[in-house]
A protein has these predicted regions:
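Extended helical coiled-coil dimerization/tether regions that scaffold
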Residues: 1-11, 175-179, 185-301, 322
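Switch/communication elements of ASCE P-loop NTPase nucleotide-binding domains
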Residues: 1-65, 259, 263-332
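Residues at beta-strand starts and edge strands
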Residues: 12-13, 32, 87-93, 121-125, ...
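Non-catalytic alpha-helical coupling and interface elements of nucleotide-dependent molecular machines
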Residues: 51, 61-69, 100-102, 134, ...
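Short alpha-helical segments and helix-capping/turn motifs at coil-helix boundaries
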Residues: 76-81, 145-153, 249
Length: 332
């Protein structure tokens, strides 16, 4: 972003990634084992199997985390291991974010570096991730600014860096089904529409429904007869003269539990795998739409071929390119 020109049409992007002793990328004489420059819009990683495409996505996930709040931690397999030797005890990932708008820069102002150019002041954010082993434990840290003397990044700024991640899809129907910790509930819980977890309109709807259910068992209905029978049975084998005040109550309501009861279904009966995969992707991309907080708009898509057949891939790529043109989303 060149503030001197007042450019606000661009959005911040991941412009460079450097990895040191991460997975198969060995650092030599302090130089990164892999260095990639990214650009705006769609960035395609092309290579043979085991060439490191997944490592690039995983490196970005370790640094940025994801909007659906997946559990992301370094593991033993992340440390470079020479053939026949012990694995390294440390790996590092450096990431440069550039092209800030003023709305975005205000959220990171204490962390930004700047460079005076002929077109104005260019701001960048330098992220330095490090993981290391001590015995059997693995520790990690993320710092910003100077590589040797950086500072920790605070909670809000950290949240604004999270990426949208489409993982390799194996079973779209299961991913979109209801259940504890379901994918669709994770997506909805992290959407701005559900930011208020305690006083949401959905909670009011369920409170009203629960009140009507409880009233069913105390009004002039079959439900009242059921409750009276339970009380009568209890009184008959309780201490003599002890009245029963048993009640039928609904459970406490939490937004998370409500959203976990939802499933996302295709309108067709017995839809094909491609239709389900597109439905899954459409739901995942929900988290890219909001731009009110001035956060990073980045989608990480792994193994597109695992999601769709070739024609559907082309349609999705065309959509993603249009999405960038309209909303300045970066896709890797």
């Amino acid at each position: 972003c060149k503030f001197a020109t007042g450019s606000e049409g661009e959005k911040m992007i991941i412009s460079e990634l450097r990895v040191y002793d991460f997975r198969q990328f060995k650092s030599v004489d302090g130089a990164p084992g892999l260095k990639i420059t990214f650009h705006k819009g769609l960035n395609a990683l092309i290579g043979e199997n085991d060439s490191g495409k997944t490592a690039v996505i995983d490196a970005l996930k370790l640094v940025l985390l994801t909007q659906s709040n997946e559990y992301i931690r370094p593991s033993d397999e992340d440390f470079y291991k020479p053939v026949g030797e012990d694995a390294c005890s440390e790996f590092k990932i450096d990431c440069t974010i550039s092209d800030f708008t003023q709305n975005e820069a205000k959220n990171f102002i204490e962390y930004l570096s700047f460079n005076q150019t002929e077109n104005g002041i260019e701001y960048t954010l330098e992220l330095h991730y490090r993981a290391w082993k001590e015995g059997h434990k693995i520790y990690q840290e993320l710092r910003v600014g100077d590589i040797d003397d950086g500072i920790s990044i605070d909670g809000k700024a950290r949240e604004l860096l999270k990426a949208v991640y489409l993982k390799p899809l194996r079973d779209a129907e299961r991913e979109m089904s209801s259940g504890r910790g379901s994918r669709i509930s994770q997506i909805l819980l992290n959407h701005p529409a559900f930011k208020d977890k305690k006083e949401h309109a959905v909670l009011d709807i369920f409170r009203d429904a629960n009140k009507r259910i409880e009233d069913y068992f105390i009004g002039d209905t079959d439900g009242k007869h059921i409750l009276q029978t339970i009380r009568s049975n209890l009184e008959s084998f309780s201490d003599k003269g002890q009245a029963s005040n048993a009640e039928l109550k609904t459970s406490d309501i939490q937004l998370k539990a409500i959203l976990e009861s939802l499933s996302l279904n295709a309108p067709e009966i017995n839809p094909g795998l491609g239709e389900l995969n597109l439905l899954f992707i459409a739901a995942e991309l929900l988290l890219l739409k909001d731009d009110t907080d001035g956060g990073l708009k980045l989608a990480l898509i792994e193994e597109l071929e695992a999601h769709l057949h070739p024609q559907a891939q082309l349609r999705l790529i065309s959509y993603l390119q249009n999405e960038y043109n309209e909303n300045d989303v970066q896709i890797i």
